[in-house]
Amino acid sequence: MSDVKDILIEHPIDIPEMNVKGFIDVVAIMESGEIFIYDIKTMGSWSWRFKFGRGKGNPSIHQELQLGTYGYAIREEFGRCDGLSLICYNKDTSDMHEVGVDLDFIDQSYNFWTRVQDLQKNGMPMLQDGECPVMDWECKYCNYKELCDARG
């Protein structure tokens, strides 16, 4: 592994064609030119056991799609993205675990956001649970929450 040239923290992204803005936790730019993205996820012991324990729960791809979206933005900005990783931190024990995410999620996230944009062309669509937003708690951050609440 080559040496780190630069580290970007809370790096802003803006993808107008996807109507997506956000911040990447960590972007590591290596002397070799390689670029790696890290998204830090904090979780309690129950979530940690669910994700890493013996009886691992069903995987959810929303975190992978989020990283893929970040990868798309970095690839557009810098011309490349060489690695995606979740850094999971157990806030109860301070344990950490790195989970690599396949670079195919860059294209999957692009396809996901393209589909959302296509659905939105005729106004705000009635999206199914698990599409967009993927998780119910994400609604509180959405600019259109009141419209969804009003439609039932």
Where do the language-model regions lie?
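A short acidic, glycine-rich active-site loop
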Residues: R54-E64
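Catalytic cores of nuclease domains that cleave nucleic-acid phosphodiester backbones
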Residues: M1-K56, F78-D82
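Metal-dependent nuclease catalytic regions and adjoining charged, substrate-binding loops involved
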Residues: S60, T69, A73-G152
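Short, glycine/acidic-rich beta->alpha junctions
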Residues: M18-N19, H62-Q66
